[in-house]
C-alpha cells in the first residue's frame, strides 16, 4: 500500500485529486416543555438567557453547507453549558448560544460504530449486519458500499462530501468512506488509536488519506483541526457536507505534549494485547478535563476558519457526541454511561447553529436521536431518501423552520442484553438483570423511581412497541 507523507502546512488540499468531481415548537413553553435537563443543572452564563425554541418562519436561504461535528465518548454534562462544574468549553457554549441547544438529544446507540451506522444510514443499527457489531472490532463487517448514506444521497443532489477523522464503519479493502459516498476521506478506520503513533487496536498504523496510508506523527487532534480548517476555507463551487469526527476525548488518555505516556502505551501495544490502548491503568479527571477543553479549542479553530471563509451565514453547524461518556465523564444527574441504555449511555450534548434560518439563544426539549439528523439534513439539502431503504428517523426541518411540532413517537434502542424505548416523557428499560422498568423522565432523569408496578398497562404497551420494532431487525449472531 502506498505511503503518503505529511505536510504541516494547513493550506494543502485534503487530497491530491481535485475536489468537486464528481423547525419552533410553538412559542409557548407548554408546547416545548420546560427543558428538564437544563433545569437540573445550575444556571450558567450560557443558559440563563435561553428561550424555548421558536422557529423563525418566513425566512429563505440557499441550501446550507453542512458541518457535522462529533466528539467521541463525550458525556452529556461534559460541556459547561450542560452543567459541568469544572470543564470550561467556551467555544461550544458560544456555538449553542448562537443557535439552539437540545436537552433531550440521543445517540442512535450506546457505542461508537452503531451510532455512526444510524447517522450515516438514517436507520436503526440493527437494519444492517455491520450495525450489529457493538462496536466493530475486526475486518469481517462494515457499512455495505451499496447501502445509501447521508453522503451518497447528498452527493447525488449536488453536494461535495468529505469525512475527516474517525470512520469506524469497517476496514479496507471492503469498506471505506470513499466507497460509501464521501468524495474525500482523511482519518482513521478503527475505533481508537494512539494519538501520536497512530497505532490502532491491533497494532496497525491507522492514518489514511483516501485509501492510502498517510504519515504524520503529530498529535492527532491538531492534524484533524488543520485539515478541517483547510476544507471549510476552500473556494467551493457547490454546497458541501463535512463530517468532522474527532477521537477526543476517547481513550487512551493522552493530551498534546504527553509524549512519555504515549511512548509507554506504544510499548504495550507492540508487546501484544489490547491493554495498552485501552489504558485501563491511566487517565484522571484532570487529564480528561484537559482533553475535553482541547476538543473545545479545536472546534473553535475550525469555526474561526469557517468565519474567515465568509460562509458562516449559510453553513449549518451541528455538534454532538457519538454516545454517552466513559469512565471520567461527568454525567450528573443521569445514570449509566457508554454501552448502557440508561440515560447516561445514550443522551448526548447537541447544539445546532444556522444563522440564515435559526435564531440564537434558544433551547429545545424535543426528544430526538441520530437518525433524525439524517432525515433532516437530506431534506434541507434537497435530497430524497432511497425508498428501498426507508429511514427510521424523521425530518425536523418542519420543526426547525416552520414551527411544526412532531407527533409523539417512539425512540427505540437495542444493544446486547439491554432494551429501551422512549415515548414522550416515559421510558421503558430492561437492563442486564432482565427486569422490565418504567421511568418518567420529566420527574426522574436519574431513572431511580421505577413505575412499572404503578403503571402496568403503560409498561405493557411500551414493551409491546419495543418488541414490534425489534421483530423487524436483524437478530444478533449467536456468541461463539
Predicted regions located by residue number:
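Formylglycine-dependent sulfatase
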Residues: 2-5, 11-34, 41-436, 441-480
